UniProtKB/Swiss-Prot annotation:
Taxonomic path: Eukaryota, Metazoa, Chordata, Craniata, Vertebrata
Protein name stated in the entry: Protein phosphatase 1G
InterPro entries named in the record: PP2C, PP2C_BS, PPM-type-like_dom_sf, PPM-type_phosphatase-like_dom
Organism for this UniProt entry: Homo sapiens (Human)
EC number in record: 3.1.3.16
Topology with respect to the bilayer: Lipid-anchor
Binding site residues for Mn(2+) 2: D60, D441, D496
Catalytic activities: O-phospho-L-seryl-[protein] + H2O = L-seryl-[protein] + phosphate; O-phospho-L-threonyl-[protein] + H2O = L-threonyl-[protein] + phosphate
Modified residues (Phosphoserine): S183, S527
Record's subunit section: Interacts with NOL3; may dephosphorylate NOL3.
Length: 546
């Protein structure tokens, strides 16, 4: 089934929070692997990036989950470390942080960490394994030589003499197993079995929590707890949500770079095949001749395809099987400080605000065929194919990672074929702004911005049997199920990983209960009996809210 499972993985990782005391921002998130063979999304929900700022973000990885997870782990701190951030210049800080984390992906230390996240062996591990294999071969040969040295001539003849004439004739073109060297283990061994860890619910715990990680096979979370790995810097205010799904061997991301290198070998093999054919006896059937003509036509078509792929290549850009080089991620990051919403985006994930029920896009989808993006790609020496892919590879034009598209030494990072420089949009929040949605393209490829806003708008005021408003995460879960394709027979719509966060700009429940609470205080002064009744009612409502 290619890149898809036989059945979708619909287990969701979900959670809710109410924000920080100084910045109450109720939020809910959910993530689902879906039809994909692995989960490559990640996200951040950090109500207190600092005492005045909240951060929410989604990362949609491609070529592996490692870059998305790395960004979820380190980007929040990198943003805070920027000089511009400390000076209160949040737009500049986001631009600098995106470029800074992208540059870090090329360092040896980070490449090793990415390899560990991805489950790929590092160069050191490969070398050690190679040396160990050579030692094993040497030991086997030494043991065999020692055994033969102690054998009699009769025993040697018995072992080798009978096999002297049993070997197959040597092939003129060189024998082989039919397997390409290095075709196995491109992504290391299969990952560990899926596992989850749950933390107990805390009824009176802190309201500010940070959710950091990716989601694939974990149980639905609660407001105060999620499954995950502790120790992530951005998740110290609360647990994270993380689990690993079994990995299949990685398909070579830069296949189109390799084909031309094999072209000369294929040509030599074709020449040798033709020589062998000429040496065979004459007189074969017309059916065989037709089959040979069909084969020739197929070979010519393959050669034409190879020539087209070779035309797409850029000199000096060899495909490199290295995390951060053949893998990357989109990133959409929203910072909320006071009444200011600042959104940075690189890629095709999206942030949308509901303004009096109307969808307001706070980000642009970066596609290679867009005029601005296409001009930059061509200027960097690349081209966009008919199916909207950069040099036949990526179908987006901005991303963190993907460094084999960023090797033009004559251009700065922001002007490379694939750029990590984000677009920035700023919005001053008013009473008309109800909520914000941040999601990967697994959602936006199925539903438009307005359709998502309408869907949430129709659910956000619904109450459960106890009269409580629905959890935001339950609305997101319903949205994910709505977007999931029934099968994979279509064009891939609804078959992608899905991650979505809903953030409300106003406290939920609190505004509705405040007038009643004030009235009860007045009754307490006027009537002791009324005070007792209302006091008991207050306790019940408080218990529900907690």
């Amino acid at each position: 089934m290619g890149a898809y499972l036989s059945q979708p993985n619909t287990v969701k990782c979900s959670g809710d929070g109410v924000g920080a005391p100084r910045l109450p921002l109720p939020y809910g998130f959910s993530a689902m692997q879906g039809w994909r063979v692995s989960m490559e999304d990640a996200h951040n929900c950090i109500p207190e990036l600092d005492s005045e700022t909240a951060m929410f973000s989604v990362y949609d990885g491609h070529g592996g989950e490692e870059v998305a997870l790395y960004c979820a782990k380190y980007l929040p701190d990198i943003i805070k470390d920027q000089k511009a951030y400390k000076e209160g210049k949040l737009q500049k800080a986001l631009e600098d942080a995106f470029l800074a984390i992208d540059a870090k992906l090329t360092t040896e230390e980070v490449i090793k960490e990415l390899a560990q996240i991805a489950g790929r062996p590092t160069e050191d591990e490969d070398e050690k394994e190679k040396v160990a294999d050579e030692d094993d071969v040497d030991n086997e040969e030494a043991a065999l030589l020692h055994e033969e040295a102690t054998m009699t001539i009769e025993e040697l003849l018995t072992r080798y003499g009978q096999n002297c004439h049993k070997g197959p004739p040597h092939s003129k073109s060189g024998g082989g197993t039919g397997e390409e060297p290095g075709s196995q283990g491109l992504n290391g061994e299969a990952g560990p079995e899926d596992s989850t860890r749950e933390t107990p619910s805390q009824e009176n715990g802190p309201t500010a929590k940070a959710y950091t990680g990716f989601s694939s096979n974990s149980e639905r979370g609660t407001e105060a707890g999620q499954v995950g790995e502790p120790g992530i810097p951005t998740g110290e205010a609360g647990p994270s949500c993380s689990s690993a799904s079994d990995k299949l061997p990685r398909v070579a991301k830069s296949k189109f770079f390799e084909d031309s290198e094999d072209e000369s070998d294929e040509a030599e093999e074709e020449e040798e095949d033709s020589e062998e054919c000429s040496e065979e006896e004459d007189g074969y059937s017309s059916e065989e001749a037709e089959n040979e003509e069909d084969e020739d036509d197929t070979e010519e078509a393959e050669e034409d395809d190879e020539e087209e792929e070779e035309e797409m290549m850029v000199p000096g850009m060899e495909g490199k099987e290295e995390p951060g080089s053949d893998s990357g991620t989109t990133a959409v990051v929203a910072l909320i400080r006071g009444k200011q919403l600042i959104v940075a985006n690189a890629g095709d994930s999206r942030c949308v605000v509901s303004e009096a029920g109307k969808a307001l896009d706070m980000s642009y989808d970066h596609k290679p065929e867009d005029e601005v993006e296409l001009a930059r790609i061509k200027n960097a020496g690349g081209k966009v194919t008919m199916d909207g892919r950069v040099n036949g590879g990526l179908n987006l034009s901005r991303a963190i990672g993907d460094h084999f598209y960023k090797r033009n030494k004559n251009l700065p990072p922001e002007e490379q074929m694939i750029s990590a420089l984000p677009d920035i949009k700023v919005l001053t929040l008013t009473d008309d702004h109800e909520f914000m949605v941040i999601a990967c393209d697994g959602i936006w490829n199925v539903m438009s911005s307005q359709e998502v806003v309408d869907f949430i708008q129709s659910k956000i005021s619904q109450r459960d049997e106890n009269g409580e408003l629905r959890l935001l995460s339950s609305i997101v879960e319903e949205l994910l199920d709505q977007c999931l394709a029934p099968d994979t027979s279509g064009d891939g719509t609804g078959c992608d990983n899905m991650t979505c966060i809903i953030i409300c700009f106003k406290p939920r429940n609190t505004a509705e209960l405040q007038p009643e609470s004030g009235k009860r205080k007045l009754e307490e002064v006027l009537s002791t009996e009324g005070a007792e009744e209302n006091g008991n009612s207050d306790k019940k409502k408080k218990a529900k809210r907690d």
